[in-house]
Amino acid sequence: MAFRIEKDTMGEVQVLADKYWAAQTERSRNNFKIGPAASMPHEIIEAFGYLKKAAAFANHDLGVLPLEKRDLIALACDEILANKLDDQFPLVIWQTGSGTQSNMNVNEVVANRAHVLNGGKLGEKSIIHPNDDVNKSQSSNDTFPTAMHIAAYKKVVEHTIPCVERLQKTFAAKSEAFKNVVKIGRTHLMDATPLTLGQEFSAYAAQLDFGLKALKNTLPHLSQLALGGTAVGTGLNTPKGYDLKVVDYIAKFTALPFVTADNKFEALAAHDAIVETHGALRQLAMSLFKIANDIRLLASGPRSGIGEILIPENEPGSSIMPGKVNPTQCEXMTMVCAQVFGNDTTIAFVGSQGHFQLNVFNPVMIANFLQSAQLLGDACVSFDEHCAVGIEPNYPRIKQQLENSLMLVTALNTHIGYENAAKIAKTAHKNGTTLREEAINLGLVSAEDFDKWVRPEDMVGSLK
């Protein structure tokens, strides 16, 4: 195995000869052997690709970086964005809490790759310096938070939202398809008055719609970038106008509406935007957990449960019980939601730990955020494709449950009063008879009036 010698301010370090990273990356590799290698999310590396390219363009426009260096840095960044350098980012999230070592990993790779693109060889002195050129007008303290926002925004907008919208549309379509299917309702897990299966599914569609609105409402805060604040938010060592220009380039390169942060001291010292947006992801997870639970309970059986809906049978459910099929998509969804709840606890805690001018829990915060955003999107697509689109009413079971429910007696309240209606229900329950039989036996309602007043289809309100 061949090595070359790289240097930093602490001295010489051996680096694998064919790798573009240099001394600081290698030190981090050796000092933080914690968990799987290269666990820094790819989305963060991609975000740095946009960021470093934008910085090179802004620095050139403002007269502090020559055109040749700008173009070489941009070429190397384009290779990062094209996933051509994925094996050059070996660092873990368990490193310095500011993300300094990953920032330097990108700086070193861009500098060395730019040198090679210019005809040089690894190990030679590069015309592009990782600090003086690639990191010009920047600090890890403003670049890593900026990369966090870019990565989080892109993941939510390009993945999470479209995937949740897909499932929401399916529930809305099912609500319309099932609008005339009258069934018994349940509160406290006990029988209640009727509603339609369409009305029940309309609640699921509405929950996801509100969750999507909440998520989208957090995006303006998330779109604010810290870049230009440098070390503590003052913008030290940046040319005038740099913060506005560099973010304009990021917006151009990503085709997303990023803006410079209103207050860069807040943008470095706190990550409330990440906490806020993940809170909306938690809200969606809460809704999805409730929906998945409802669906697996409504589908329970096939003969000894509620069994009012039929869900797709995707795979055998047991290694010992022949013919058993389980609500596996519901179970996967609830596990994903549980993971999001755990991630939210981590994010909320580390979000509270910004001391003075900097929060130093950045890598773990963004890793948890990106996992939540990815998992929720993936789970919604999986649930939609393998469960939701195939849900159908179990008409015989719905009819049986509806006719057996004692809570249809509620329709008699306005005619004979609550206490008399309760007497009918309790007597029917005790004797194992029907409401109609006991209403007539007790002399409280005639057969004709019972048939006129107790009509489940008239108890569900508007079907529109």
Swiss-Prot record:
Alphabetized GO MF terms: fumarate hydratase activity
Pfam families: FumaraseC_C, Lyase_1
GO biological process, one term: tricarboxylic acid cycle
Pathway(s): Carbohydrate metabolism; tricarboxylic acid cycle; (S)-malate from fumarate: step 1/1
Active site: H188, S318
Reaction equation(s) it catalyzes: (S)-malate = fumarate + H2O
EC nos: 4.2.1.2
Cellular-component GO terms for this entry: cytoplasm
Keyword Ubl conjugation: no
Residue positions binding substrate: 98-100, 129-132, 139-141, 187, 319, 324-326
Main location: cytoplasm
Residues of the site described as Important for catalytic activity: E331
UniProt enzyme class: lyase
Miscellaneous note of the record: There are 2 substrate-binding sites: the catalytic A site, and the non-catalytic B site that may play a role in the transfer of substrate or product between the active site and the solvent. Alternatively, the B site may bind allosteric effectors.
Quaternary data: Homotetramer.
Protein name per Swiss-Prot or TrEMBL: Fumarate hydratase class II
Gene source species: Haemophilus influenzae (strain ATCC 51907 / DSM 11121 / KW20 / Rd)
